[in-house]
UniProtKB/Swiss-Prot annotation:
Function: F(1)F(0) ATP synthase produces ATP from ADP in the presence of a proton or sodium gradient. F-type ATPases consist of two structural domains, F(1) containing the extramembraneous catalytic core and F(0) containing the membrane proton channel, linked together by a central stalk and a peripheral stalk. During catalysis, ATP synthesis in the catalytic domain of F(1) is coupled via a rotary mechanism of the central stalk subunits to proton translocation. This protein is part of the stalk that links CF(0) to CF(1). It either transmits conformational changes from CF(0) to CF(1) or is implicated in proton conduction.
Source superkingdom: Bacteria
Keyword field contains Ion transport: yes
Alphabetized GO MF terms: proton-transporting ATP synthase activity, rotational mechanism
Family, per entry: Belongs to the ATPase delta chain family.
InterPro entries: ATP_synth_OSCP/delta_N_sf, ATPase_OSCP/dsu
Taxonomic lineage of the native organism: Bacteria, Pseudomonadati, Pseudomonadota, Gammaproteobacteria, Enterobacterales
Compartment(s): Cell inner membrane
Signal peptide: none
Main location: membrane
Record's protein name: ATP synthase subunit delta
UniProt GO cellular component terms: plasma membrane; proton-transporting ATP synthase complex
UniProt-listed Pfam families: OSCP (PF00213)
Length: 181
């Protein structure tokens, strides 16, 4: 696991704890979505690499966010930006948002699974995979289907950090690894 992901998870967990304590998860989700969207802008990212002091960088970022959404950013949200700028972590905002969203889905007993296949799956095939995963995870499952011709055949299922690889490409790779050892 990369160190950036670990750091982003730490921020996401801290923000999630505040959101649960304040009973305002949706508000924080929309704030982090805004911060993430703004931080993905090329011009804003170029600010992150300039030699600006953290307070100045935070103020500029917050001003951009306020201008974008046409309303003030609250004090708690500003403090998150100040802390992340102080530690040179503003580039992690999209990852923090993704991890926060994952924590929210766990909190409401819903999990998103990514189903990757070589060809588009039919509705009944997706439903069968979704039902099996919902039973296995004991949660409501939101499937996201993607097509990747490189896997040759079969299905890959991703649930957070867990990967279930039932693809031909994965089997060939594992067979090759066994034969070489």
């Amino acid at each position: 696991m990369s160190s950036m992901l670990v750091v982003a998870r730490t921020y996401a967990q801290a923000i999630f704890d505040i959101a649960v304590e304040q009973k305002n998860i949706n508000k924080w989700k929309s704030v982090l979505d805004l911060f993430s969207e703004i931080s993905l802008n090329r011009l804003v990212q170029s600010l992150f690499f300039r030699c600006l002091e953290p307070k100045r960088l935070s103020d500029i970022f917050i001003a951009i966010c306020e201008d974008y959404q046409k309303k003030q950013v609250d004090t708690f949200s500003k403090n998150i930006i100040y802390i992340m700028a102080e530690n040179n972590r503003l580039l992690l905002l999209p990852i923090v948002f993704k991890e926060f969203t994952y924590l929210c889905s766990i909190y409401v007993h819903t999990v998103e699974i990514e189903i990757i296949s070589a060809w588009p799956l039919k509705y009944n095939q997706l439903k069968k995979i979704t039902d099996i995963m919902a039973k296995r995870l004991s949660k409501t499952v939101n499937p996201v289907h993607k097509v990747d011709k490189d896997i040759l055949a079969g299905v890959i299922i991703r649930i957070g950090d867990t990967v279930i690889d039932g693809s031909i490409r994965g089997r060939i790779f594992r067979l090759n690894h066994v034969l070489q050892s």
